[in-house]
Amino acid sequence: MGPTASGKTGLALHLAEHFPLEIVNADSVQVYRGMDIGSAKPTLQERQAIVHHLIDVTTPDDPFSAGRFRTAALEVIEDCHRRGVIPALVGGTGFYFRAVEQGIAEIPEVDAQIVAELNRRVCDEVGLACCYAQLQQVDPPWAARVEPGDRQRIVRGLSVYLASGQPLSYWQQLSCQQAPEGPALRICKLAIEWPREQLYARINQRFEQMLKEGFMEEVQGLLSRGYHGDLPAMRAVGYRALIGYLQGAYDLARAVELGQRDSRRYAKRQITWLKAEPGLQWLAPEGAKQAALDEVRAFLQFFKKK
């Protein structure tokens, strides 16, 4: 686990050199084919060296929900257990981890007319900022997890409230209080804790490196294949900043600035979530690989004795 650019993949690959381990992707963008550079997807060489699951599962126009992820991940986990292999979930998408461990919230269905009306209001009437302010009033916990420009999640929060009379965060909390269906899991949670300024510097540097590796061309290719900017996948951090540049909304310098800013904000939200994650072991960057080895060995030895 861990925020973007913290070194999750490198740590997982190191562990795989010492344990019978296969990696289960828990990044909500790496599930999409063609979204490689911007999602920091493991290289082909890395994926050939160590078995990776749930990468390139579907196309960017096919939303991959937390429910779909939970079903697929549990199948992989059970298969790994049957073969005597350790499944290691690697990624920074908190609701994917939560879906596996706690189950999925049973949220009431929302009539399509409500969603359509909210989208119309956002586009044609009051605007996104006003809708976000309304979300802050009716569902502060959900609003705190949503970017002011995230139209999809703002509409999602308001639509559930209008349809059920209860905020989305209420239904999520209700589900978390219930025992999830599925196998009981024993989990060792690890994350690398960088000083904030060092992490932000890594994020800025990585975004620039992605551009050198062809991130802009990747986005151009996705758009040329018909994957438009309103798709949830295409609004992922980094992608939407470059789409704005390609559509003439601002210059390249501004696109880089927005991409880096959005990545830093995303990391901040990830850290906030991780700080509240029970049982998580934080590792200092110096010596993180050895510390992770020690933690995993102790974890496996503890349950081996039981």
Swiss-Prot record:
EC nos: 2.5.1.75
Role, per record: Catalyzes the transfer of a dimethylallyl group onto the adenine at position 37 in tRNAs that read codons beginning with uridine, leading to the formation of N6-(dimethylallyl)adenosine (i(6)A).
The gene coding this protein: miaA
Assembly, in brief, is:
Monomer.
Q: Which domain of life is it from?
A: Bacteria
Keyword match Magnesium: yes
GO biological process terms, alphabetically, are:
tRNA modification
Per the entry, which co-factors are needed? Mg(2+)
Q: Which residues bind ATP?
A: G2, P3, T4, A5, S6, G7, K8, T9
Which SUPFAM superfamilies is this protein grouped with?
P-loop containing nucleoside triphosphate hydrolases
Catalytic activity field: adenosine(37) in tRNA + dimethylallyl diphosphate = N(6)-dimethylallyladenosine(37) in tRNA + diphosphate
Q: What is this protein called?
A: tRNA dimethylallyltransferase
